[in-house]
């Protein structure tokens, strides 16, 4: 109900603002904030909003007396341009000075009454006609209220003026307003122009008994309305002409033994005035002389300190206490059932209590009182249920309230088709069995959802005979008036907490994904920030930064880029072979590296070398000792070859480990000593022995350096060693050579042949052997 009302407030235009005004008005009228909060949650903490065209509103616990300390509120919302008309059927609110204790408030009112419409007392108020398309209603009972007033019951209808026609069960006023048919000729002007009370030949449709104020009762057989005080009811004297004030009176003795299978009894102060100065204690023993169950129904009017105890079995304490009832159960009927056919009822009342005791009826289950009809029957052909052991009286027939679990008391009513049931209040509306007890109102007053003995599938049956949705069961919020929907629930986490946890985990997971995405994005941007601004010059600069390390000092001398210096080591044959192997491996590695680079990389490399590097020998052309000349010998496969057609140059000086002097700088031979002559050819210079030579091929041979006896003469000949002249020129052995140093080799060569390529290389590398 509260959930449905909240949903209705969202759909109504301006409903929230109007609800705020309602709250402020209630605070102003009651003077307490604590009274305003329950008012917004009408009667048991529920807000009741009405948007139906026709409906019925009544006070809490109707038709019983309303409880003290109650705040209720209702809100009727119409369409734009609608006029809302309210007519009171019953009205009994405890009267006080200026209606300061208990009151009913309606607003906004029509001109000339602009202020709120505040009511109390027992007289039927005039019809209320709204000035706008909405009406708010407040009901308040003070905590000090006696609780002896019945309350009110009103009907309303909304619509526009100037209607051309009305529904079949409605009456059209002269001003075009449509009213329910029973409102015609009821002595109350609901049309506003008096047209509903004109030409009335029949008496008012309301029975005269309904016009008696609270605290009185009518004489049912009187031709005119006569209301008597309740103290004269069942006092042993006939005050009504037909004796109706003494008809059907219960036994008012203070306790006795009852032996019939049905009967009734009441406390002595039920119809009496205020209790005397002494306490009252009465006990009733009920013995139906039957082993079947016995049903007990009580209507309580207890005072603040009064109470009733019901026991199963006979005796002052009985066998088992069934229930203890206090004033809190005053305004609702109480039904108890004993497993045996015997009951004990004990009543305790305080002196000068404001209560009026109780009225009780009992019967064996399955039997009905003489003036009642059974809900069940011997067969279910007439609409009854074989298992329904309830009863109903003739006034309860077709009153819109189910007194039988099978609904037999509401079947076959003349106002509805055979397969439908009437709504409460005589509105003429009907509903089907499928609309019964499904937590969805089909009647304006919700009669189809009251006194439910069973519920439709998908709903839960409350202890107060109401039905709610099954999903509202154990959701942490009491939706039944007795809170039975939250009883027996497991100690589980409420659904709201689970929903909040799921939403929170989803949000946290989403934030984690976003954080990881940002981290990966930043990492990607940092790794790509240089590539994002890459140009031709940046690529060339990167290539320049990644160039190979410059050659060492020894490699520069070996390549002939710088002249030899003193004390630089001399390459022996074994060292030259190792160096040649290293160079060959380097060339292969460079060729392999060049094969991986694309043409564009090679072109960029050549362009960079031309722009920023001074000319130098290609990588593959590495001279052994000195810069390349036409007659220079380049180390190819371990031997020196002269270039063809070139003039024979003096042989390149062989370097020893201790000195870098050339052979031509040898000191002259000793004077007077003839030069030594080799086996064939001119005589050897002074200080040299005949070298030991061995042929390598047809044109070349290798000679071991002859032993040097002394420094060579300065004028020693510098003739190259050849096949015809096998005497090589050698350098002087260094004095720094140790005894284990390898002996230098002299290489004899023919005139150098022309240079020709020996090995395949890349585009920017040239390997020539001369």
From Swiss-Prot:
Signal peptide: 1-36
Membrane topology: Single-pass type I membrane protein
Ranges of the Cytoplasmic topological domain: 518-770
Compositionally biased tracts (Acidic residues): 761-770
Extracellular-side positions: 37-496
Glycan-bearing residues: 71, 199, 359
Subcellular localization(s) per the UniProt record: Membrane; Membrane, Coated pit
Domain CUB span(s) in chain numbering: 43-159, 254-365
Disulfide bridge partners, by residue number: 43-72, 99-120, 166-178, 173-191, 185-200, 212-227, 219-240, 234-249, 254-282, 416-430, 423-443, 437-452, 455-467, 462-480, 474-489
Domain LDL-receptor class A: 165-201, 211-250, 415-453, 454-490
Stored Pfam families: CUB (PF00431), Ldl_recept_a (PF00057)
Cellular compartments per GO CC: clathrin-coated pit; membrane; plasma membrane
Region Disordered: start-end pairs: 635-770
Bias kind Basic and acidic residues: ranges: 689-707
TM helices/strands, residue ranges: 497-517
Polar residues: bias regions: 729-738
Tissues/organs with expression: Widely expressed. Highly expressed in skeletal muscle and ovary. Expressed at intermediate level in heart, brain, liver, pancreas, prostate and small intestine. Weakly expressed in testis, colon and leukocyte.
Keywords: Coated pit, Disulfide bond, Endocytosis, Glycoprotein, Membrane, Receptor, Repeat, Signal, Transmembrane, Transmembrane helix
Top-level lineage group: Eukaryota
A GO biological-process term: negative regulation of fat cell differentiation
Record note on quaternary structure: Binds GGA1 and GGA2.
PANTHER family: LOW-DENSITY LIPOPROTEIN RECEPTOR-RELATED
Family: Belongs to the LDLR family.
Described purpose of this protein according to its UniProt entry: Probable receptor, which may be involved in the internalization of lipophilic molecules and/or signal transduction. Its precise role is however unclear, since it does not bind to very low density lipoprotein (VLDL) or to LRPAP1 in vitro.
Name of the protein in its database record: Low-density lipoprotein receptor-related protein 3
The species this protein was found in: Homo sapiens (Human)
Record gene name: LRP3
């Amino acid at each position: 109900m509260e959930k449905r009302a909240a949903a209705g407030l969202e759909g109504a235009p301006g409903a929230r603002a109007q609800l705020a005004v309602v709250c402020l008005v209630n605070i102003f009228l009651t003077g307490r904030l604590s009274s305003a909060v329950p008012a917004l949650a009408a009667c048991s903490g529920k807000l009741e909003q009405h948007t139906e065209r026709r409906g019925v509103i009544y006070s809490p616990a109707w038709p019983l007396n309303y409880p003290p300390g109650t705040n209720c509120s209702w809100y009727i919302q119409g369409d734009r341009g609608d006029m809302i008309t309210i007519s009171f059927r019953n009205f009994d609110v405890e009267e006080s000075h200026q209606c300061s204790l208990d009151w009913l408030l309606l607003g906004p009112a029509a001109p000339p009454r602009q202020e709120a419409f505040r009511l109390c007392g027992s007289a039927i108020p005039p019809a209320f006609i709204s000035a706008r398309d909405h009406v708010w209603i407040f009901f308040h009972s003070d905590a000090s209220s006696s609780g002896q007033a019945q309350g009110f019951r009103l009907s309303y209808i909304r619509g526009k003026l100037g209607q051309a026609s009305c529904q079949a069960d409605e009456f059209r006023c002269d001003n075009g307003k449509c009213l329910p048919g029973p409102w015609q000729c009821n002595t109350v002007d609901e049309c506003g122009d008096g047209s509903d009370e004109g030409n009335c030949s029949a008496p008012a449709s309301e029975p005269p008994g309904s016009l008696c104020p609270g605290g009185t009762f009518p004489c049912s057989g009187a031709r005119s309305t006569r209301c008597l005080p309740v103290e004269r009811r069942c006092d042993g004297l006939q005050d009504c002409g037909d004796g109706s004030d003494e008809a059907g009176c219960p036994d008012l003795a203070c306790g006795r033994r009852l032996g019939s299978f049905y009967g009734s009894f009441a406390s002595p102060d039920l119809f009496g005035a205020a209790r005397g100065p002494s306490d009252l204690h009465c006990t009733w023993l009920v013995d139906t002389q039957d082993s079947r169950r016995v049903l007990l129904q009580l209507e309580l009017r207890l005072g603040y300190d009064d109470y009733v105890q019901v026991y199963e079995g006979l005796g002052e304490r009985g066998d088992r206490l069934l229930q203890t009832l206090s004033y809190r159960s005053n305004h609702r009927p109480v039904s108890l059932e004993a497993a045996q056919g015997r009951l004990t009822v004990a009543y305790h009342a305080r002196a000068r209590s404001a209560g009026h005791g109780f009225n009780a009826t009992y019967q064996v289950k399955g039997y009905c009182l003489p003036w009642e009809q059974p809900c069940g029957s011997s067969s279910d052909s007439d609409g009854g249920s074989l298992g329904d052991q309830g009863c109903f009286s003739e006034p309860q027939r077709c009153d819109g309230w189910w007194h039988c679990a099978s609904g037999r008391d509401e079947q076959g009513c003349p106002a509805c088709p055979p397969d439908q049931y009437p709504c409460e209040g005589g509105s003429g509306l009907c509903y089907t069995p499928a609309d019964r007890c499904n937590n969805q109102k089909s009647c304006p007053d919700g009669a189809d959802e009251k006194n439910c003995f069973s519920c439709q599938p998908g709903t839960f049956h409350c202890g107060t005979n109401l039905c709610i949705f099954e999903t509202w069961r154990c959701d942490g919020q009491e939706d039944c008036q007795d809170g039975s929907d939250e009883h027996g629930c497991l100690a589980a986490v409420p659904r709201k907490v689970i929903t909040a946890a799921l939403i929170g985990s989803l949000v946290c997971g989403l934030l984690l994904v976003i954080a990881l995405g940002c981290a990966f994005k930043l990492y990607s941007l940092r790794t790509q920030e240089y590539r994002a601004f890459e140009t031709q010059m940046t690529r060339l600069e990167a290539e320049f930064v990644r160039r190979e390390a410059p050659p060492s000092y020894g490699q520069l001398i070996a390549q002939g880029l710088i002249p030899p210096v003193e004390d630089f080591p001399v390459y022996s044959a074994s060292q030259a072979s190792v160096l040649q192997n290293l160079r060959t491996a380097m060339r292969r590695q460079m060729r392999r590296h060049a094969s991986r680079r694309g043409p564009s990389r090679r072109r960029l490399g050549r362009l960079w070398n031309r722009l920023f590097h001074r000319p130098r020998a290609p990588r593959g052309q590495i001279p052994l000792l000195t810069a390349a000349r036409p007659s220079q010998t380049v180390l190819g496969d371990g031997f020196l070859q002269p270039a063809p057609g070139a003039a024979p140059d003096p042989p390149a000086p062989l370097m020893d480990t201790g000195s870098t002097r050339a052979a031509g700088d040898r000191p002259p031979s000793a004077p007077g000593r003839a030069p030594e002559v080799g086996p064939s050819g001119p005589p050897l210079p002074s200080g040299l022995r005949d070298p030991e030579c061995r042929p390598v091929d047809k044109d070349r041979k290798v000679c071991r350096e002859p032993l040097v006896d002394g420094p060579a003469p300065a004028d020693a000949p510098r003739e190259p060693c050849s096949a015809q002249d096998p005497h090589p020129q050698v350098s002087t052995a260094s004095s720094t050579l140790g005894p284990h140093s390898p002996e230098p080799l002299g290489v004899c060569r023919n005139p150098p042949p022309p240079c020709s390529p020996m090995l395949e290389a890349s585009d920017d590398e040239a390997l020539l052997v001369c």
